[in-house]
Amino acid sequence: MNFIKTEKKLIKFLKKSLSKTYTENFIVGISGGLDSAVVSALCAKAKPKNTFGLILPAKSSDKKNLNDAISHCEKWGIKYEIISIEPFLQAFRDSRNDEISRIRLGNFAARVRMSLLYDFSAKISGVVVGTSNLSERMLGYGTIYGDLACAFNPIGELFKTEIFEFAKFLNIDEKIISKAPSADLWEGQSDEGDLGYDYASLDEILRAILRKKSLAKFDQETINFIQNRIKNNKFKLKMPKILHLKG
C-alpha cells in the first residue's frame, strides 16, 4: 500500500463526503483503539477545527483505553467529551427479567454508543464517521445499527493488518498500535479472542477470497470458518429490503 497516496485519497474522500451532507463537523467514537484513532486522525487532518470525539466507556472498560483515548484527542487537537454508558447498561439490566448474555449486552452497548454519537451529531450539525475495517466488514464482526452505523467510512476497504501499518505512517501512538484489538464490549474482551484467529491469518485468506485467488495453501478449517462467517453475516452490510410497489 502506498501510504502517501492512501492518506491523500482518504482525506479528499472525507472532505468531499462532508461537503455533500451540508453539515460542518466530523464525529468519531473514540475508544482508545486503533481503528478509531486512525479515522479520527484522518478527520483531524481533513478538518482540524471541525473534528469531535465522543469517548464512551462502560464500568467494565479498561482504564488504559480511556487514558489512551484522551491522550490521542489531545495530541491531534480533537475536541472531545466523555460520557459513561453505564447508566444505560444498568437500566437495560434492570428492565429485563431474564438472563442477559454477553453478546446481547455487548450489542446493546454498541447501539447505545451509536445512539449517543448520532444525538451528538444533531447537536453540533455533524456526521458520524465509521471506524469498521474491511476485515470486520467481510466477517460481519460488528453490530448492525451499532458500530457498523455511520454516514461514511474512510477505512472500510482497508484490512486490519493494513491499518496497523498505516497507523505507523500516520504517527499514531505506539501504545495504541501495540495493544490487542478490542471492541470494549465487556471486561477482557478482544477481537482475536472472539474470532479464534489472529488478524494476520484471517486477512491472508480474506485477501485471497476478495481477489478470487486459490485457497489451496490454507488450512481448510480456517477457510470454512471464514466462508461461513461471510455467508451468515453479509446481511449486515445491506440496506433494508423494500418491496417496490410502484413502477
From Swiss-Prot:
Mg(2+) binds at D35, E136. Deamido-NAD(+) binds at R111. One of its GO terms (biological process) is NAD biosynthetic process. Gene3D superfamilies: HUPs. Catalyzes the ATP-dependent amidation of deamido-NAD to form NAD. Uses ammonia as a nitrogen source. Keywords: ATP-binding, Ligase, Magnesium, Metal-binding, NAD, Nucleotide-binding. It holds the Pfam family NAD_synthase. InterPro entries: NAD/GMP_synthase, NAD_synthase, NH(3)-dep_NAD(+)_synth, Rossmann-like_a/b/a_fold. It catalyses: deamido-NAD(+) + NH4(+) + ATP = AMP + diphosphate + NAD(+) + H(+). GO terms for cellular component: cytoplasm. CDD domains: NAD_synthase. Pathway: Cofactor biosynthesis; NAD(+) biosynthesis; NAD(+) from deamido-NAD(+) (ammonia route): step 1/1. This is NH(3)-dependent NAD(+) synthetase. Belongs to the NAD synthetase family. ATP binds at G29, I30, S31, G32, G33, L34, D35, S36, T131, K160, S182. SUPFAM superfamilies: Adenine nucleotide alpha hydrolases-like. Its EC number is 6.3.1.5. Homodimer. One of its GO terms (molecular function) is glutaminase activity. It comes from Campylobacter hominis (strain ATCC BAA-381 / DSM 21671 / CCUG 45161 / LMG 19568 / NCTC 13146 / CH001A).
